[in-house]
Amino acid sequence: DSGLQLPEHTFYVDFYYSYQPFPWVKRIQYLDVPFYHYFIGREGQSVQTDVMIRRVAQLRLVNQRMVEATPEPGTVPDGLYRYMIHFLAIESSVTSVFLILSKDKANYRLKDELWADIDKASPAIGRDVRRKLVSRALNLRGSVGRWVIRRGYVVAEKVVGFN
């Protein structure tokens, strides 16, 4: 019913795969079944910082698809809408972090475009996504803002241990 089609030859589609069909979901059942085992720490993994920076265009594509899939407020139950806005804010922030970590001025413009595209797709969705604390933190302006975000990533990586 959802018409889900994953972009071909693209990493990070799990964000989109677990997001786009939600408006059609009537019931969720958790199965504690290990369908695959993910080995963290292997060289060249798609979640390593340097790999994610190299593949940031794929993160951006997934983000664009997620924006397109986000329902307008009032068209789905409020709890679902809030969840989807929360998920979109997180994924948009992840993409923004790696655009900033790249230290590429063209990617800084792409980060600004990412947030502008959300606003353009729907002012209501843009407003709701930007209200999230993580979204506000990732939109600190200028070189000082980018420095704070880079340092924040380093601290968060040490505390949480993403990679």
Short names for language-model regions:
Residues V76-Y81, G126-R127:
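Short, surface-exposed acidic
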Residues A57, L61, G79-F87:
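Residues within HEAT/ARM-like alpha-solenoid scaffolds
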Residues L101-N163:
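Membrane-interface aromatic/basic loop that binds lipid-linked glycans or pyrophosphate carriers
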Residues Y83-F98:
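Amphipathic alpha-helical repeat scaffolds of TPR domains
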Residues E8-H9, P73-D78:
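Short helix-to-loop capping/linker segments positioned immediately adjacent to catalytic or ligand/cofactor-binding
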Residues V33-R42, Q48-T75, V94, F98-A124:
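Catalytic core of nucleotide-sugar-dependent glycosyltransferases
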Residues D1-M52:
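Conserved nucleotide-sugar donor-binding catalytic segment
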Residues P7-Y19, V62-M66, R146-F162:
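Short charge-dense sequence patches
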